[in-house]
């Protein structure tokens, strides 16, 4: 089987996430073209939320799910990395590559990348640590609906 390109992996992630929201009973809207900073909008009972889908990878130790939180464009003058802000999107949305668990993470708590941990750090650090269970899709939908 032919290996998937980065672009195709991104398309599969985005389409899988849109389907997940549809299966939950929420409407999904998509902008025309690819000129917007968000990938799609989810209508949570009248609350419109801009989502940016991101393909995630497991870290080598398999205790973290990692995804980039910037868009990268390539052209003749080089590589251009642009951070997402609260003006661009509301949430990043990703899916575990094996279990297909969906995670929804607020843009304003992410830096250059996001690591969602499945186990606490061995050194006991708590500051800046994002536990994956706190951002599971169903839990985050409840928070969005109640905010």
Where in the sequence are the language-model features?
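Mixed-charge (Asp/Glu-Lys/Arg
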Residues: 1-36, 42-147
